[in-house]
Structure formats: C-alpha cells, structure tokens
Amino acid sequence: MTYKLILLRHGHSEWNAKNLFTGWVDVDLNDQGREEAARGGELLVENNVLPDVLYTSLLKRAINTANIALDKADRGWIPVKRDWRLNERHYGALQGKDKAQTLAEYGEEQFMEWRRSYDTPPPPLDDDSEFSQAHDPRYADLGDALPRTECLKDVLIRLMPYWESDIKEDLKAGKTVLVTAHGNSLRALVKHLDGISDEAIAGLNIPTGIPLVYDLDENFKPLNPGGTYLDPEAAAESIKAVANQGKK
C-alpha cells in the first residue's frame, strides 16, 4: 500500500511583498499569490494528481490559495478540514516588523537564529499588540495553548498529534490528501517525513504556490525523499527568493 500526499504553500501574500514578518497575522494573497495559486491548480490537473480531501490552516492566505487551486482543478467539492495546528509559526514580537530593518537592528546572527534555528523563539508578543491574536474569536477555545511566540520545534510539537489523528487516517483510507499551509508548518511536516536533522532544517525553504508531492510507503516513509515538485524549475527560482528574504 502506498499513499499520496500533496503539500502546497500559500501563494505570495501582501506582507511577503512588503517583506514583513507575518506569522499568525491574517493577511491575504496579493495578485501574484492568486496567480501562483491558480497555476498550482493547473499543475495538479496537468500531472493528474487530484486531491480527495483538503486540509488548511485558519489563515485566509492558505484558505484562499486552496480555494483558487481547487477551482482550477475542478475539485472545489472535496471535503475541507481546517485547524489552527496548520497555522504558520507564530513569530512573536517580530510579527509586523520589516525583515530588512530587523536584520539591520539585531545583526545577521540574531536575525537568522530567530528566523531559522530549530529551537530558539523570538521574544513573545504582548496581548495588547495590534498584531496579537489573544482576542481573535477563531482561537477562543485554545486558552493557555494560544502561542505568543514559537520556534520551529513548537510548530512540530503542535502539528504532530494532528498528523497522527487526522491527516494520516485519511491517507490510510486511500485518499489523496492536499495540505495547503505555510512555510514553517510545511517545513515542520517535511522535517518529520524526511527525518531531517535539527541543524539541516535551517537550510530548507519551501516555495510559494508550487505543489510538492510525496509518495509514502506503508510506514509513511517517502518513496521519493524530499518529495517531487510539479514544476521543479519554478520551485528552484522561488526557493532562492525565499532564502533571500530580509536581505533587501
């Protein structure tokens, strides 16, 4: 028995374009992002990789990416499951800050530690910040579980129970699963799937809007380690752009 998992990072967002740390701030796609999402759906059709069920975060840039892609693929009718555990990493007090200014203010070592280290979160975000989710009704049931900051390790810890209880169960049922989420929630999942070390994960970037397909064996180990991008050339270019964020 083999399983098929499709990972799709949301398209370019309004804050990607402004080079701001986004995290849990609910910004939408820009025109480029909507075009990327549409192209992602076209790639699913061209490669005959059509999902049976969709998982997304609670953030509109992921939700709208999925909606656009599925519309292009004529799969808007499939079941949808949304969960906060697929949200982007919470960037704490960095949310809303300009990446280039943060780099200049704190230096490259601190900047990269906050942005890319596995287990070092940024300073926490105050609940009275305009970028806080402390009073957001979609997270009202989380209570003390609502993060004020996260590192990638925290994202993995919150994501793994959902992977085990829900996503894997749909895969076991023979469904092709599409997970439309965010750079860091997908990096956490890829780290788990590919067994990437805590140190090596710092160098992994995931492009926006390009489906990444994993074929998994009966033990949910990749038959194609690293997955297969449905547009490898575009993925390589986009990965470079993601890696350079904060340097402009």
Swiss-Prot record:
Disulfide cross-links: none
Keywords: Gluconeogenesis, Glycolysis, Isomerase
One BP annotation, GO: gluconeogenesis
Molecular function GO labels: phosphoglycerate mutase activity
Enzyme Commission number: 5.4.2.11
Pathway in which the depicted protein is active: Carbohydrate degradation; glycolysis; pyruvate from D-glyceraldehyde 3-phosphate: step 3/5
EC class (word): isomerase
UniProt xrefs under PANTHER family: PHOSPHOGLYCERATE MUTASE
Function: Catalyzes the interconversion of 2-phosphoglycerate and 3-phosphoglycerate.
Family: Belongs to the phosphoglycerate mutase family. BPG-dependent PGAM subfamily.
Protein's name in the database: 2,3-bisphosphoglycerate-dependent phosphoglycerate mutase
Organism: Arthrobacter sp. (strain FB24)
